[in-house]
């Protein structure tokens, strides 16, 4: 499936600050809004590759796009970085490899109050819906050892990637912890949700994604 070349969900690289406001865990970016604050459906997701938390792989997230001319991410002069979806590094998770099915992303961090409990809900959804739906959790700026400890203690089996410097969360304009991103096959945004969801509501969102995917497929035929 050909994906649009205009990556409207992305902004330049800046560091993110983690703050708590009115009980909601927020990630501040320099962008004018956060993902999910406006009607942004049907936009293509930006490409990325992240170290698998279980693999011991080192390095930051690769957010280089495959088309510098069309991408809204600035490509520095002389940049030779391999596009994210073309990396072949052991221990890397490429989001493009998950575009074959509906996809749910979760952005979270350990300083985010009940974010760890929300990852438990994410795990329950993974066990219920995979392999009909792909899932990937992205931890923002925690230590590798801390994330691996949580994975073991909480018996998570879903994939977990590492956003060590916060560049990926800024790329996606993540505005709160947790932020869930729901996408159609092909990596096209359906919708997002920010903040705590109980299991029933989260499962309802995944069911809605599956229903919308079926309807979209029928429309595109």
Stretches with model-predicted labels:
Residues 43-45, 90, 98-100, 130, ...:
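Extracytoplasmic
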Residues 99, 107-124:
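Conserved redox-active cysteine motifs that mediate thiol-disulfide chemistry
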Residues 117-164:
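Conserved segment of the thioredoxin-like fold in thiol-based oxidoreductases
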Residues 1-81, 215, 219-221:
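N-terminal targeting signals for export/organelle localization
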Residues 65-88, 93-99, 116:
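Sequence contexts marking disulfide-bonded cysteines in secreted/extracellular proteins
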Residues 100, 149-157, 164-217:
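Thiol/disulfide oxidoreductase modules built on the thioredoxin-like
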Residues 53-54, 88-89, 185:
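Short, ordered coil/turn segments that flank beta-strands lining enzyme active or ligand-binding pockets
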Residues 104-105, 135, 180:
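Hydrophobic beta-strand anchors of alpha/beta hydrolase catalytic cores
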């Amino acid at each position: 499936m050909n994906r649009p070349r205009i990556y409207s969900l992305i902004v330049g690289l800046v560091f993110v600050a983690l703050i708590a406001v009115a009980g909601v865990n927020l990630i501040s970016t320099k962008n004018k809004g956060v993902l999910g604050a406006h009607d942004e459906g049907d936009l293509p997701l930006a490409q990325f590759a992240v170290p698998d938390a279980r693999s011991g792989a080192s390095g930051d997230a690769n957010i280089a796009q495959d088309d510098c001319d069309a991408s809204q991410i600035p490509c520095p002069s002389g940049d030779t970085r391999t596009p994210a979806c073309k990396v072949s590094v052991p221990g890397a998770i490429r989001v493009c490899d998950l575009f074959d099915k509906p996809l749910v992303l979760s952005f979270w961090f350990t300083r985010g109050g009940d974010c760890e409990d929300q990852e438990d809900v994410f795990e329950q959804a993974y066990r219920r819906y995979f392999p009909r739906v792909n899932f990937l959790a992205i931890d923002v700026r925690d230590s590798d050892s801390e994330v691996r400890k949580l994975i073991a203690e909480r018996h998570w089996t879903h994939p977990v990637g590492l956003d060590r410097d916060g560049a990926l969360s800024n790329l996606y304009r993540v505005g709160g912890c947790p932020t869930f991103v729901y996408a159609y096959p092909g990596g096209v945004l359906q919708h997002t949700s920010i903040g705590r969801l109980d299991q029933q509501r989260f499962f309802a969102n995944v069911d809605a994604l599956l229903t919308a995917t079926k309807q979209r497929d029928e429309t595109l035929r």
